[in-house]
């Protein structure tokens, strides 16, 4: 139901573009289940903030200036949580499901909603069987894999470094015990 991925500095921009469906013309999303005609129905939960990949990446970089970072090559600059909507969720409750999921994720982050730079609901991906065929529901409509992408800067409280309230530390936010609190 939920998946967590960590990204280094060089990976973040591409994944923001993927989540916001801003892959350049002629390039592939790497996911053939995406129905591009339905991509216009995807929506953000950020209330006007970070609506383009450029805005989101700029916001992330500005926020990182306020956060202590160790000088490491393998430093995690972003964490993404993908929350899948249950198949049995009634259509009229999907928006509420994603909003409650987003609010819960933000409530577990030391920096709260401020560190989130992508919160995008995808309704444009279809379910395929193992042979690669799109699965249809009882009415002949393609089954949808609606899900929420939340990307955030993994800032945690910092008491060691003067001038910084937070430091980058994805490990503190993605430990097994902490993940079990999110989804036992």
Question: Where would I find each of the regions flagged by the language model?
Answer:
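N-terminal nicking endonuclease/strand-transfer module with a His-rich metal-binding environment
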Residues: 1-184
């Amino acid at each position: 139901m939920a998946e967590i991925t960590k990204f280094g500095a060089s990976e973040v921009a591409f994944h923001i573009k993927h989540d916001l469906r801003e892959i350049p013309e002629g390039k592939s999303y790497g996911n053939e289940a995406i129905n591009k005609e339905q991509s216009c129905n995807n929506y953000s939960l950020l209330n006007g903030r970070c609506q383009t990949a450029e805005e989101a990446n700029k916001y992330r970089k500005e926020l990182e200036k306020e956060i202590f970072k160790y000088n490491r090559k393998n430093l995690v600059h972003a964490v993404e949580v993908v929350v899948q909507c249950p198949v049995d969720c009634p259509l009229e409750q999907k928006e509420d499901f994603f909003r409650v999921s987003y609010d819960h994720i933000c409530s577990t982050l030391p920096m709260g909603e401020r560190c989130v730079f992508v919160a995008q609901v995808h309704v444009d991906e279809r379910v395929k069987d193992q042979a690669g065929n799109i699965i249809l529901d009882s009415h002949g409509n393609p089954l949808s894999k609606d899900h929420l992408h939340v990307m955030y800067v993994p800032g945690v409280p910092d008491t060691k470094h003067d001038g910084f309230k937070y430091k980058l530390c994805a490990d503190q936010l993605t430990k097994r015990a902490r993940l079990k609190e999110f989804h036992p």
